[in-house]
Design a protein with these regions (language model features):
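Aromatic-lined carbohydrate-recognition surfaces of secreted/lumenal glycan-active proteins
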Residues: 99, 172-182, 238-239, 245, ...
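Active-site-adjacent "subsite" loops/lids of carbohydrate-active enzymes
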Residues: 86-105, 180-228
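N-terminal targeting leaders characterized by basic, low-complexity, disordered sequences
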Residues: 1-30
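Conserved, mostly hydrophobic/aromatic
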Residues: 127, 166, 173, 222, ...
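Substrate-binding cleft of secreted/luminal carbohydrate-active enzymes
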Residues: 310-324, 332-413
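Glycine-rich, aromatic-flanked loop segments that form ligand/cofactor-binding clefts
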Residues: 126-128, 157-202, 238
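Catalytic domains of carbohydrate-active enzymes, especially glycoside hydrolases
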Residues: 111-137, 230-237, 308-312, 384-392
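Aromatic- and acidic-residue-enriched segments that line the glycan-binding/catalytic groove
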Residues: 140-150, 182-204, 247-258
Length: 413
């Protein structure tokens, strides 16, 4: 069982890195040209400036009017960082948003079209932004020692600037924090790394290391990242890759506590994370595999045990990732509406009686089978809303979303 997002995100990440380098090179070249022009113009205008100053030195100008502050929802109990981003946004009854990578958050070409979708009343009212991604990269500098020592800090976007922009538009902000898959921390601190039976660092099929889920010391680092994101003013923390590995040679893994039941391990981590974070006034959620409510996948994800711990769960019920015949549907990928409805039925049954909202990840990309566009995405949205979802998020690794999918999506069946 492979998480398709690994390769998809890796490809998108590499492309984003290439675009970022090209943009920096172009920006540097433009800056040098501007500096040369400014120096030349300054030399030409220097005599004029001196004469103008001699004429106006004794005249005073009224002070400029202060800039009108952005509306906020701050309270005296909020941190300076929270107030800087306009306070927290209350959790919507029905969350409607999209996935945004760290590089998309830093790219006006990608971020501006996403922000144009914002309409808290009848359209997009939430935005999920990567803080710590599946490679272990943290999108900005933090005071966390292991983040610094491991080289995980990438300084991709300015979190306060991005959060202030999102909150000013009325958007509920969700920080995505990848937990156990991490290409940086295990190499800087092997004591918390997932190891092989020979003692080497274990790596998955993409060559990425992992933190050991059974070593509770390994839990501290992702929780610290989440705490810092909460301190900055994110409204919700979503933990992803909060599971055991699903690819790579699992037969060579030597867990620190191999006898610990997997469901108990993941449940305990999320309970500890939730208890740590909620006093900061932030909501806590997790992304789970789509079939985690249908079968025990052997990766520790058992939503029924978390029904009163998490504020929300985000099952990845992308239609194209179910095998033919799943839910009694001939080709789930070609039948998006019924597939979402069937998957949601399992999730509602598994979490029945709890306070945890179900907000599925929906598919806005094509992967075999039919092409996915506005119609197919809207079919999924309609099915999710009809079956009692507490909202949904759209996934596209390139962060380019189908037009018109948010039109009038108020959450009514």
């Amino acid at each position: 069982m492979t998480d398709f997002r690994d390769q998809e995100r890796y490809d998108a990440h590499q492309e984003a890195m290439r675009n970022s380098r090209r943009a920096k090179q172009r920006s540097s070249a433009r800056s040098q040209q501007r500096r040369r022009r400014m120096i030349a113009v300054s030399i030409l205008l220097l005599p004029v400036a001196i004469a103008a100053f001699a004429f106006t030195w004794s005249r005073s100008s009224p002070p400029p009017k202060p800039a009108k502050p952005l509306p906020t929802t701050t309270t005296p109990n909020q941190s300076a960082a929270e107030q800087a981003v306009g306070g927290r946004i209350a959790m919507p009854d029905h969350v409607r948003g999209v996935h945004v990578t760290s590089y998309a958050a830093a790219s006006p070409a990608l971020f501006e079209p996403i922000m144009a979708l914002a309409d808290p009343k009848v359209g997009m009212n939430a935005i999920q932004i990567d803080v710590k991604d599946e490679r272990g990269e943290i999108a900005f500098s933090t005071p966390i020692p292991l983040g610094k020592e491991s080289g995980a800090h990438q300084d991709v976007y300015e979190p306060v600037k991005v959060l202030r922009r999102a909150h000013a538009a009325g958007l509920y902000t969700i920080a995505r924090v990848v937990v156990f898959q991490d290409g940086y921390a295990p190499q800087a601190d092997p004591s918390i790394a997932l190891r092989t039976t020979s003692g080497a660092l274990w790596k998955n099929d993409l060559g990425i290391t992992w933190l050991d889920p059974t070593n509770e010391k390994a839990w501290d680092y992702p929780i610290q990242v989440a705490q810092y994101a909460a301190e900055l003013g994110f409204d919700e923390i979503m933990f992803d890759y909060v599971r055991y590995p699903t690819d790579g040679d699992a037969s060579t893994i030597a867990f620190a506590d191999p006898g610990r039941p997997r469901q108990d391990t993941i449940t305990a981590f999320l309970k500890k994370a939730s208890a740590t974070l909620k006093p900061q006034g932030v909501h806590v959620s997790a992304a789970f595999f789509g079939l985690a409510a249908t079968d025990d996948l052997g990766i520790g994800q058992w939503p029924g045990k978390l029904r009163n711990t998490l504020d929300a769960v985000y099952p990845m019920i992308y239609p194209s990732h179910f095998t033919d015949g799943q839910f009694g549907i001939d080709k789930p990928g070609d039948t998006p509406g019924p597939t979402i409805a069937a998957a949601m039925s399992d999730w509602r049954r598994k979490t029945n009686g709890g306070s945890m909202q179900i907000r599925p990840w929906l598919q806005d990309f094509t992967l075999g089978g039919i092409n996915y566009g506005t119609r197919e995405v809207r079919e999924q949205i309609s099915a999710a809303d009809r079956t009692g979802a507490g909202g949904w998020l759209l996934w596209n690794a390139q962060c380019v979303y189908s037009p018109g999918v948010f039109n009038g999506t108020s959450g009514q069946p």
